[in-house]
Regions:
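Glycine-rich phosphate-binding P-loop
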Residues: 1-5
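Small-molecule kinase domains that catalyze NTP-dependent phosphoryl transfer to phosphate-bearing small molecules
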Residues: 38-47, 52-53, 129-174
C-alpha cells in the first residue's frame, strides 16, 4: 500500500486513521490502537446485544453515546470520507472499500497470499518463531474478518467487494504494486 501510494504520489492512510479517531473521540491514540486490537470480543458482544451501529437505536445517537468500539468505527469512517474528499489517496483496511463504495473514482483492491507464503514473509520480517507468527496471523485475520463483516454485512475477501484482487504469493509484491499503479492510471 505505502509503496503504491508513493509511486502514485498519493497520501497513504493506515495507522494515521487511529490518530484521527483518537482526536475525534478525545481518547489517547494508544487506547484506540489497543481497543482496535481487541475489537473481536467487543464486536461479538455488541452484536449479541443488538447494539451495532445503526441496528437498534431509535434515533441517531451522539458519538459519545455509542460504545467505544462503535465510536472508533464512526470516527475512522469520518476520517476516511474527509481524506477521500481532499484528494486521491490509499487506505489500508478499516472498511474503506465499503465506506467509499458509492464513489465512482475508487479502486477497491484486495491483496492476498497463501498462508505459507504470508508466514514465510512474516518470519523474514519479524524474525519470530513460526508458531508465534502463525497464531498472530490467525488472530489478525479473524479480527479483520469479524470487523469487516460486522460493519459491512459483506464477506471479507469476497471477490464481489473489490475491483481488483491480486495474489501476491504468485505475482510478488513488486508486480502487485505495478498492477495497482497501472489500474489507477
Amino acid at each position: 500500500g505505502l509503496t503504491a501510494a508513493k509511486k502514485l504520489g498519493m497520501e497513504f492512510y493506515d495507522k494515521e486513521l487511529i490518530d484521527a479517531a483518537a482526536k475525534e473521540i478525545g481518547f489517547p491514540a494508544e487506547i484506540i490502537a489497543d481497543r482496535e486490537q481487541r475489537l473481536t470480543n467487543s464486536l461479538l458482544y455488541n452484536f449479541a446485544m443488538g447494539t451495532l451501529y445503526g441496528l437498534s437505536y431509535p434515533k441517531e445517537p451522539k458519538l459519545s453515546e455509542l460504545p467505544l468500539t462503535e465510536q472508533i468505527y464512526v470516527a475512522q469512517k469520518k476520517a476516511i470520507e474527509e481524506a477521500a474528499k481532499r484528494g486521491s489517496c490509499v487506505f489500508i483496511g478499516r472498511c474503506a472499500d465499503y465506506i467509499l463504495r458509492s464513489r465512482p473514482d475508487v479502486l477497491r483492491v484486495f491483496v492476498y497470499a497463501d498462508r505459507d507464503i504470508r508466514l514465510r514473509r512474516a518470519i523474514d520480517e519479524y524474525g519470530d518463531l513460526e508458531e508465534h507468527i502463525d497464531e498472530f496471523m490467525h488472530q489478525t485475520d479473524k479480527r479483520r474478518r469479524i470487523y469487516y463483516e460486522n460493519y459491512t454485512n459483506q464477506r471479507w475477501g469476497d471477490r464481489e467487494n473489490y475491483d481488483l484482487m491480486l495474489n501476491s504469493g504468485d505475482l510478488g509484491i513488486e508486480k502487485c504494486v505495478e498492477l495497482i499503479c497501472q489500474a489507477v492510471k
